[in-house]
Amino acid sequence: MKNKLAYICSPYRGNAYKRIRNIAYARHITRVALELGYTPIATHLYLPQILNDDIPAQRRRGLKAGKDILNTCGTIIIGAKYGISEGMASEIEAATGKDTIIII
């Protein structure tokens, strides 16, 4: 049986306006993934509620947790509408060999 877990990769950081926009976009991509039959995992929708993304040590911890979760997923879904952030580029590099879906 194919692994239907899909890691949602889209921007998060930015000023208050961009964060609101980016969170809405991540929710949209997550909804699309569900409609495509995937079980989506969007770590940037819940880890910032626990960790402070503006504190470098906590950001690194969150990025590592995300990559650990990414390793369990068969697919990465990339939301590229607002570009590829540094964090996204790192996740995309870590996802080499996984099925990839790009949503713009």
Where are these regions (language model features)?
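Catalytic phosphate/metal-binding cores of nucleic-acid and nucleotide-processing enzymes, i.e., regions
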Residues: 1-104
